[in-house]
Amino acid sequence: MTEQNELQRLRAELDALDGTLLDTVRRRIDLGVRIARYKSRHGVPMMQPGRVSLVKDRAARYAADHGLDESFLVNLYDVIITEMCRVEDLVMSRESLTAEDRR
């Protein structure tokens, strides 16, 4: 195999992993929508600081256990959590408006 072919094969493998990563992020957001609906129906506050800490701590432990940069994974989860909170807030606001409209 030529060096160029090897590079193309490696990039194709990376592209496949990127597809899996993006699909996983989409699935995580979809699950966040379901969680937001549950929270809205059961009066659970959107922000759960204990849960946020647990998720970030788990990312840091994973990084340490697998030789990855802890700050990178914690920062990555900061971005993911920020987006999840934004989505949950939107969903819960809509759920609240829908409930008020039914009265």
Swiss-Prot record:
The UniProt record lists the keyword ATP-binding: no
Enzyme class: isomerase
Pathway: Antibiotic biosynthesis
Disulfide bonds: none
Pfam families tied to this protein: CM_2 (PF01817)
Keywords: Antibiotic biosynthesis, Isomerase
Catalysed conversion reaction: 4-amino-4-deoxychorismate = 4-amino-4-deoxyprephenate
Domain Chorismate mutase: 1-92
InterPro entries: Chorismate_II_sf, Chorismate_mutase-related, CM_dom_sf, CM_II_prokaryot, Isochorismate_pyruvate-lyase
Gene3D superfamilies the UniProt entry points to: Chorismate mutase
Xref: PANTHER family: CHORISMATE MUTASE
Name assigned to this protein: 4-amino-4-deoxychorismate mutase
Gene: cmlD
